[in-house]
A protein has these predicted regions:
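…and closely analogous acidic/polar surface helices at protein-protein or active-site interfaces
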Residues: 71, 80-109, 116
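Von Willebrand factor type A / integrin I
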Residues: 143, 157-217
Length: 217
């Protein structure tokens, strides 16, 4: 008689190399705060009472700005056919951002070419499985959305230049990063070649959007 076979579930190896190191590298994002102006102003009753008392009973109203909540991170995966093999990496990235605790919310979106060839987004890697919306939905004038685009930078949106224009549009409002899954030796063969350098944060409250790149000699 043959021996009984007992199936065992073995966790798959992570796709992202050194996830703990990646988490540590992302910790500075915990200090990110949107630089937008307050959306509205309300009366600060406590400060008004204290100021009025110091003024001898003359009412001296004090107002304070009310801002939106903490920043969110939106992870946007290029859904071109060459990116299908990186689906699990995208899921792992979501877990890392959720565990980081730096953002109020972690939003996952997929980038597709629209009927006119431009950028559209949806909640599914299959363009037919969920409604397609204009990529303008990724923009937030309050600056509270940090964007991470996951792409090999070789699909149709990169060949047409639409992806580059989307990055430029988003980077005017808040930090944007591209996570390139291909080996570094292949980066300059893509539609988004790189220049090595040092990234420095700008000074003051708007520093997160005033990044300076100094090229390596």
């Amino acid at each position: 008689t043959g021996a009984a076979v007992l199936p065992l579930g073995v966790p798959a190896a992570p796709v992202l190399p050194a996830p703990l190191e990646l988490s540590r590298a992302l910790r500075p994002l915990q200090r990110y705060r949107p630089v937008s102006a307050p959306l509205r102003r309300v009366l600060d009753e406590t400060a008004t009472a204290e100021r009025s008392a110091r003024a001898g009973g003359v009412i001296m109203p004090v107002f304070r700005g009310v801002r939106r909540g903490d920043a969110v991170v939106q992870c946007v995966m290029d859904a071109s056919s060459s990116m299908l093999v990186w689906d699990r990496m995208f899921e792992e990235l979501q877990q890392i951002f959720a565990q980081l605790g730096a953002f109020r919310d972690v939003q996952m979106r997929y980038l597709h070419p629209g009927p006119d060839g431009g950028c559209t987004v949806s909640r599914s890697p299959d363009p037919a499985a969920a409604p397609l919306h204009s990529a303008d939905r990724l923009s937030d004038p309050t600056g509270r959305r940090v964007t991470v685009v996951v792409s090999d930078c070789a699909g149709p949106l990169w060949r047409s230049g639409h992806a580059h224009r989307l990055l430029h549009q988003l980077a005017r409002l808040a930090p944007v990063a591209v996570l390139q899954p291909l080996p570094q030796r292949m980066w300059n063969r893509t539609r988004l070649p790189v220049t090595l350098g040092s990234l420095t944060r700008g000074e003051g409250p708007a520093g997160a959007t005033l990044l300076k790149v100094t090229g390596d000699a």
